[in-house]
Amino acid sequence: MKRTIKYLSFLGLIPFLSITTISCVKQAKENNNKNQLISQFKQLIFILNSFDLDNKKLESKIIKAIEKSDFNKISNINLELTIKFLTRIKNELETKTISQLNKNDKLDILTKIKVHLGSLNLIELVNIVDELVNKLNQKEEIKNTHKDKIEKNKDNIEDIDDSKLEILESKYIPNQHNYPDYVKNFKTVSAEEIYKELYDRTFSIKFLVKLKDGGLLSNGTGTGWLLDYHKYSNTNKYKMFIATNLHVLADFSNSLTDEQNKEFNYYDPSGNKVIGLGLGKADNVTDFSRKNNNSKSENNIANYYLNNQDFENYLKNDFWSVNKFSKGISEPKIVFGAVDFMKDRAIKNHYEALQKEAINYYNYKKNNNEINDDNKIAWNNFLNNKDIPIMIDFAVFEFDVDLDLVDYNLKSWISNAISGLDNYLDRLNKAPILPNQDKKISKYLQTTDYVSALFKKDKSEQNLYNAKDIYIAGYPTSQYSRSVWMQNNPIERNSSTLTSNWRSPTNDKTFAFANEVEEKAGTGLNFNIHDNYWHRVFATFYGYQYNINFSSLYYGASGSLAYNEFGQMIGIYNNVKSNVEFGDLLQSATIAPFLQSDNIKVGDNIIYAYNLIDGTDKTKYKYQKSSFRENLQKLYPNGFSDGLKSTKLFDDIFN
């Protein structure tokens, strides 16, 4: 009986098991169907990628969003309806390119996708579509701003025909550590003479800024040197023109009138204003011989003269250097900054790339909480007007000094700087022949730069395209925050056994500049975006920069003048590797040249000729709109306060 009962009980389970089995099979079919539907959501990758071709991370973002989404709460019917819609969109996009659609068509498609995804509560995917909508609106805004800018400057843009310009083709040329035979025609100048001249012309510089709220700020030091001067008539007074890096003048704000600041595009929207100048120098430096690398000597420390007593009070707790007020120095003013110095025609092909890079950088900083009170002003200014000027790291400021009102020490500094520039010009004048310099065109500067010489088919035997030795000296900041006089080219630079650069021969055979260059405005358009100059957003850099060996002067030396071995000034020191330590001089750095004498085609773009010091020859520098000399003409239309129109470099700033 028990066995029967067991049997019956088993038989009684059969219908139940059958029902359960059927239910599981049905559930499995539903799950498989849902999984297939979910997999079809990956059509979104193709669709959304069509709207943002440049976003390499979009595919992985969509996949992650799909994996995170809870599809179990969505009915198969709703999934099927959405997938049918996505399939239709995908098929349409496969038959036409996204470029055939106008902005409204694109927004319409994205909005419908967003509505479908929103109805399924797929929030992660909705957010991705939202990002694309915002990007699309930004791109359209950039294009419209670009069109407005072109229309506004139509005359400026259309007045030049590239077909009438001589244009050089850039090409890859390996580093060259040798000179052509005709180099023997040029006479070199001793290292000691060059370093002495650099010392005389060079100063450590710092500035005092009055903040909009009434506070004061002095932020770091740099290096500057005497580019030019004007001697006032019947007096012992001079106007000194000091060249340095634009980044050294990052807080050098609103020194001109409001109208001039806007005219030159030098305004700082923060409302801050530079009011103080600290002019520094290491006294009694007489030894200009080479030193061992990593010597880290702090014997030649700069002390400073200040133009106002507020600056002296501000620095009263600075125990590392002497800071002394002198009533003979005026308030400094900017004369030229190499920002927005090319006509719009020269950069019109870069405009969209610049806007895109700036917006990407802004979004990166915003997402990483790197927007602070200072750069917020810069980004608000950019977002309001979409202006992003291209710059080179070069600037000139001026101050007046009355030698009758200064002490003996400062008087000797100024007199020696003036003598240093005079000696430089006298030596060039007496040289029978100089490389890359037609003295009929310029008495003070090369007329053909190294890069143009490299790409030219020039058989004149007048031009060099590399430099065996380059001399740079300035005031890097030591680990104790002291500005110390220091020269490049340590003793190891001439070692016949040491190789400091793995791509080069031994140091004694390595050229300081072996035609290794960098550019940002040609192939790739990979500009660097900065938000810390004058509370503005700028892009670097126009033209070329030279990579220089044995010249890794530490921070604070920014702005130093660079000579070649023939005693010609060729550029300004502006960048060094971030891992360099104070005193290590064997690494590489960069200088920005003062000119590019020829138009050079790089990829699909042309980098047009410019001369930062004198761009007045518009047969040569057609696309340039400002330079040091041109700004002098605008700042002093009637000459200087004594009525004269001459400087040491220019007999007449107008002719």
From Swiss-Prot:
Domain of life per record: Bacteria
Cellular compartment(s): Cell membrane
Keyword annotations from UniProtKB, A to Z: Cell membrane, Lipoprotein, Membrane, Palmitate, Signal
Gene Ontology cellular-component terms listed: plasma membrane
Residues with a covalently attached lipid (S-diacylglycerol cysteine): C24
Pfam families listed in its UniProt record: Mycop_pep_DUF31 (PF01732)
Record InterPro entries: Mycoplasma_peptidase_DUF31, Uncharacterised_MG067
Membrane topology, from the record: Lipid-anchor
Lipid-modified sites (N-palmitoyl cysteine): C24
Residues of the signal peptide: 1-23
Family classification: Belongs to the MG067/MG068/MG395 family.
Stated name of the protein: Uncharacterized lipoprotein MCAP_0231
